[in-house]
């Protein structure tokens, strides 16, 4: 699949996404990179360490996080994305579930929208992605970790996200799926999702696996 100007051979190799949180309260690195100099320094270090794509986040999604407005989130990520675009030749992802933030990020140079609610939070998100023709990562998420049949329900939920994307006009070769480790799942369910990535591949799309540690 193509993300930005780079081809990703997702069928034959694994790629690394470097996470750049420009937030004061993210799970692992809150407050470390929320100045421009520190953000660019960390981005350069991740690229040297082998990151194939950089994911910029302006709002923590950890349990108990403090929500921020779309305006504040955009103000955090847009300048960083613009600076990354000028300085590095690497695809850039924006981690947001808000359509207006995604739109601003794409205009600033983002190549991929990473939505932790799989297009189910903001009704306008799918249209933003479709119109910009960027790639997207659709993550599985639920407000509560309540399941009758865990894996089949995860597959069903992800298929719903894919259906929303396709209905909006997002091409299938622009879609990545994420089982959402740490989101709406118990510890045991997180491990089950990780151990059964092969089941998720039944949907015929690339899989992104994001774990905090």
Question: Which residues does each PLM region occupy?
Answer:
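Short, well-ordered coil/turn segments that N-cap beta-strands
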Residues: 11-16, 51-52, 86-90, 109-111, ...
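N-terminal amphipathic alpha-helix/helix-capping segment at the start of soluble metabolic enzymes
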Residues: 1-24, 169-170
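Conserved anion-binding
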Residues: 24-26, 61-64, 102, 108, ...
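Alpha-helix-loop-beta-strand connector modules within alpha/beta enzyme cores
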Residues: 66-94, 99, 103, 129-137, ...
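Active-site mouth loops of central-metabolism enzymes
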Residues: 22-41, 66, 93, 144-152
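Glycine-rich, proline-tolerant flexible connector loops at the mouths of alpha/beta enzymes
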Residues: 26-28, 52-79, 181-187
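Catalytic beta/alpha-barrel core
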Residues: 88-97, 111-122, 154
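Conserved, mostly hydrophobic/aromatic
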Residues: 20, 46, 50, 95, ...
């Amino acid at each position: 699949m193509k993300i930005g100007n780079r081809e990703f051979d997702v069928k034959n190799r694994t790629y690394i996404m470097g996470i750049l949180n420009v937030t004061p309260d993210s799970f692992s690195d809150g407050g470390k990179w929320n100045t421009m100099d520190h953000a660019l320094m960390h981005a350069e270090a991740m690229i040297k360490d082998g990151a194939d794509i950089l994911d910029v986040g302006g709002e923590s999604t950890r349990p108990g996080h403090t929500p921020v407005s779309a305006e504040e989130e955009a103000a955090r990520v847009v300048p960083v994305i613009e600076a990354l675009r000028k300085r590095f030749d690497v695809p850039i992802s924006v981690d947001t579930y808000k359509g207006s933030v995604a739109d601003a990020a794409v205009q600033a140079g983002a190549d991929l929208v990473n939505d932790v609610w799989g297009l189910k939070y903001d009704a306008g998100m799918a249209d933003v992605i479709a119109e910009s023709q960027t790639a997207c990562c659709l993550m599985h998420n639920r407000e509560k970790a309540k399941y009758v049949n865990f894996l089949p329900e995860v597959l069903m939920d992800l298929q719903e996200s894919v259906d929303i994307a396709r209905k909006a006009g997002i091409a299938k070769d622009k879609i990545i799926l994420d089982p959402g480790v740490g989101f709406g799942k118990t510890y045991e369910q997180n491990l089950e999702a990780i151990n059964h990535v092969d089941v998720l591949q039944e949907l015929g799309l690339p899989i992104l696996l994001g774990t905090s540690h």
